[in-house]
């Protein structure tokens, strides 16, 4: 079970949001590159970046911070980025910087053809991020809940060639209320590609249940607020997950 630290970028700084609200941002660091190095030194084997300004603006907005992070750690561990990835040109430009994968979120739901085209242009390097409230996909920084069920979308994107799905339960992200294991497993069982859980990890007690879900296709979990606020020691959590595999 891979635990993946999240680095959320807002105006060049590392922050965390509560339930996707930009006005509910807590600043954790003015140096995202130092944050990336810290998590690498704590045993992270992959990093998850989100350009929050990009997610709201529709185009990435934190290029200097992203470049600094890649310069610091990309030679050692893969780095993935989401937020503002809404056309092939942007996706290509950011992959060329040294990112391992790009995550398409809102654009995947609004413009499914983009996913198909991106998978053809950049095979093996496209992840789709599906955010859900009560099983229905949410878009535009969680501002709009659609009529599309995430399982139907996941099956479609699997056929298009995405390498994995990141699944966020909106009701739990940044609220420290536990991962929605049941919903994540249900999604993972509906596809053959790996599903990464995101949102709600609260403590070491969550790790055994996550690891038990691995046999159903849940390959990892993204963690943010818990490791920044100290309710989870990242190194200890990854060691525990490794011991349970």
UniProtKB/Swiss-Prot annotation:
This is 1-(5-phosphoribosyl)-5-[(5-phosphoribosylamino)methylideneamino] imidazole-4-carboxamide isomerase. Gene3D superfamilies: Aldolase class I. It is an enzyme of class 5 (isomerase). It is found in: Cytoplasm. Its main location: cytoplasm. The keyword Translocase does not apply. GO terms for cellular component: cytoplasm. The keyword Amino-acid biosynthesis applies. SUPFAM superfamilies: Ribulose-phoshate binding barrel (SSF51366).
């Amino acid at each position: 079970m891979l635990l993946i630290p999240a680095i959320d970028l807002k105006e060049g700084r590392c922050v965390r949001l509560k339930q996707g609200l930009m006005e509910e941002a807590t600043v954790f660091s003015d140096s995202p590159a130092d944050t990336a190095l810290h998590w690498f030194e704590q045993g992270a084997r992959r990093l998850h970046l989100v350009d929050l300004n990009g997610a709201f603006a529709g185009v990435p907005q934190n290029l200097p911070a992203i470049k600094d992070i890649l310069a610091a750690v990309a030679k050692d561990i893969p780095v993935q980025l989401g937020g503002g990835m809404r056309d092939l040109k942007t996706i290509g430009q950011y992959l060329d910087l040294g990112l391992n994968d790009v995550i398409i979120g809102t654009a995947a739901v609004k413009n499914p053809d983009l996913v198909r085209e991106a998978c053809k242009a950049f095979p093996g390097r496209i992840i789709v991020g599906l955010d859900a409230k009560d099983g229905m996909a949410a878009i535009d920084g969680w501002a709009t809940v659609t009529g599309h069920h995430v399982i139907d979308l996941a099956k479609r994107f699997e056929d298009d060639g995405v390498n994995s799905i990141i699944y966020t339960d909106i009701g739990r992200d940044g609220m420290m209320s536990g991962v929605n294991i049941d919903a994540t497993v249900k999604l993972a069982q509906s596809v053959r590609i790996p599903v990464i859980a995101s949102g709600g990890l609260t403590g070491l007690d969550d790790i055994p249940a996550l690891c038990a879900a691995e046999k159903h296709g849940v390959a990892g979990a993204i963690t943010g607020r818990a490791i920044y606020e100290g309710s989870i020691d990242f190194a200890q959590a990854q060691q525990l997950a490794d011991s349970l595999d």
